[in-house]
From Swiss-Prot:
Record protein name field: Branched-chain-amino-acid aminotransferase-like protein 2
Molecular function GO labels: catalytic activity
Entry superkingdom: Eukaryota
Similarity comment: Belongs to the class-IV pyridoxal-phosphate-dependent aminotransferase family.
InterPro entries: Aminotrans_IV, Aminotransferase-like, BCAT-like_C, BCAT-like_N, Class-IV_PLP-Dep_Aminotrnsfr, P-loop_NTPase
GO BP terms, alphabetized: carboxylic acid biosynthetic process
Source organism of the structure: Arabidopsis thaliana (Mouse-ear cress)
Length: 559
């Protein structure tokens, strides 16, 4: 006989699920076989305690060996367990043998239901024990399947089919319906807990609208919800109130699935890296940011990026801004914790911070700024060998009359609208013109061109004066090319000998076609290649060292 263990918190539809499995012709079920041992060991009081202790086996070791794993008449045995009933000292085979899965339910739905029967507490809900069960099973090399009670209610057949697949047992349609009333396998506590279930004949549809949440449980909800979310993020099929929820996509760099990010004043795992819905970046894109690259244990142009971040924050009148040293420490700690010392890009963001209430006014921002350090394994995002293709967007670059591009702000809709045009054209990026029709930059980068050995780039009146742009301009002079900064028409770019773009994310990227016109010979030109080499030499040899890098510099790169 194969034993199936179902672990859950109370009021999670665990008994409903037990009724479902009891309808199968190949399974016998046990209703909380460890309950009496739990009550005897802990001294927890229940109105039926004395009767329970007199009728059920109270010795946990005997329960495991003689009842849970004892002989049976059917192919499978389904054991419904409440997580807190897994006591210390129980035989190890309880967890090491059989098949296990975890049933979770949002504490928002558990707490109002639980209170009707018994006073709720963190211990009574048992979510901490449920996380511990998951962790122990993972350490044994047998991570359990996780299903959500809310999804079980919304689509019982699909959820049960998926669960049966995980348990490697055939699905039976009989699991979806049963006769009203008790079943012989009910625990003797059924009159206290199962009244509603006894009126059912199957999985009831979830209520369209939830109950009003009792504020007396607000603190308990704050304690329990993170544990529920820890388990929920390990579900294969996450439940959602939105029918349009998409399956999880693949990542461009799979190693980034398990990165750590700095948010506020702490480092947290990727799935926990979130800001408040009251944060100004959510309320209005009210934030500034920088992109930085890491080369061979050094942060390239760190001081220049921090200068611009500070200038942008000052231009937007941010208050309670972290100090320069605090920002550096957050950057270094994030990189070191992730083991990222090369081939890494950082998205450094500073929001105006959380508001006391929703609204536009910065007067509502009374918590101080929110610092975010998002470091990812990320090679240059463009094809810097074969070249990229651009189109010209109909969306014009913001004028300083409206929003000064010298403020490196997070309100990027102007750029995003142009990027949508390039996506629709199936090319890499879009050139954006200023209000008079001259080239400003692309949606993501600054832009340069070569004509008769002269290097030209648009002036910075309508574009972000990029740090990579400034670096390349210095290299142009050092490489003894003539540099000219002026207004440049689109037709001049169409007829250029060479074109390239610059940015921290993509470095120096050759452009081989614009609006269907081949640039030069349609490949990387000699000036572009020479400047690429000079840029690589510069990034290899300069930057602010990351503390501790010398200790690990001989390790192989992670990607």
């Amino acid at each position: 006989m194969e034993v199936i263990h179902a672990w859950s918190a109370p009021r999670s539809l665990s008994t409903t699920l037990m009724y479902s499995f009891a309808q199968r012709d190949d399974i016998e079920v046990l209703d909380e076989p460890l309950y009496a041992a739990f009550l005897k060991s802990t001294g927890v009081d229940r109105p039926y305690k004395d009767e329970l202790l007199s009728k059920m086996e109270c010795d946990g070791e005997k329960v495991v060996k003689d009842i849970i794993y004892g002989p049976g008449k059917k192919k499978y045995r389904f054991c419904k367990h409440i997580s807190k009933q897994r006591l210390l000292g129980l035989p190890s085979e309880l967890m090491s043998e059989g098949k296990h899965f975890i049933l979770i339910r949002n504490p928002l739905n558990i707490l109002p239901s639980f209170e009707k029967i018994h006073p709720s507490s963190f211990h009574e809900l048992g979510l901490g024990e449920l996380v511990s069960i998951y962790s122990d099973l993972c350490q044994m090399g047998t991570p359990p399947a996780i299903i959500d009670a809310d999804e079980l209610q919304r689509d019982p057949e699909a959820t049960l089919r998926s669960l049966c697949d995980d348990l490697e047992i055939p699905f039976q349609a009989s699991m979806l319906k049963w006769e009203a009333g008790p079943i012989p396998e009910d625990g003797l506590w059924a009159p206290w807990w199962y009244e509603t279930l006894h009126k059912s004949t199957g999985f009831s549809s979830p209520q369209k609208y939830p109950q009003t949440f009792p504020l007396m449980h607000y603190d308990l909800l704050e304690q329990c919800l993170p544990l529920y979310n820890i388990l929920r993020c390990h579900m294969k099929h996450k439940s959602s109130l939105l029918s349009s929820t998409l399956p999880p996509p693949s990542l461009p760099v799979p190693e980034n699935a398990k990165l750590l990010a700095w948010v506020g004043d702490e480092i947290v795992p990727r799935e926990m890296a979130k800001v408040s819905v009251f944060d100004s970046v959510v309320q209005g894109g009210d934030s500034v940011w920088e992109g930085l690259r890491i080369y061979k244990g050094k942060v390239f142009k760190l001081e220049e990026h921090l200068d611009r971040l500070s200038d942008s924050a000052k231009a937007l009148a941010f208050n309670n801004v972290p100090t320069r040293e605090e920002i550096k420490e957050a950057i270094f700690r994030t990189l070191i914790t992730n083991g990222m010392f090369d081939n890494t890009h950082i998205r450094l963001s500073l929001t105006r911070g959380k508001k006391v209430t929703s609204g536009m006014s910065p007067a509502f921002n009374r918590y101080g700024c929110t610092l975010i350090v998002l470091a990812e394994w990320k090679p240059p995002v463009y094809d810097n060998d074969g070249g990229i293709v651009l189109v010209t967007a109909t969306t014009r670059r913001n004028s300083p009359n409206n929003l000064d591009s010298k403020i490196h702000h997070n309100n990027l809709l102007n750029n995003i609208l142009a990027k949508i045009e390039s996506n629709n054209a199936n090319v890499d990026d879009a050139i954006m013109l200023d209000k008079d029709g001259f080239v400003s930059e692309t949606n993501a980068t600054n832009i340069f061109m070569v004509k008769k050995d002269r290097v030209l780039t648009p002036h910075a009146d309508y574009c972000l004066p990029g740090i990579t742009r400034a670096t390349v301009m210095e290299l142009v002079v050092k490489e003894n090319f003539i540099l000219e900064e002026r207004r440049i028409s689109l037709s001049e770019f169409h007829t250029a000998d060479e074109v390239w773009t610059t940015g921290t994310m993509g470095e120096l990227s050759p452009v081989v076609k614009i609006d269907g016109r081949v640039i030069g010979e349609g490949k990387v030109g000699p000036v572009t290649r020479r400047l690429q080499n000079a840029y690589k030499k510069l990034t290899d040899g300069s930057g602010v060292p990351i503390p501790t890098y010398q200790e690990v510099k001989n390790l192989e790169p992670c990607v």
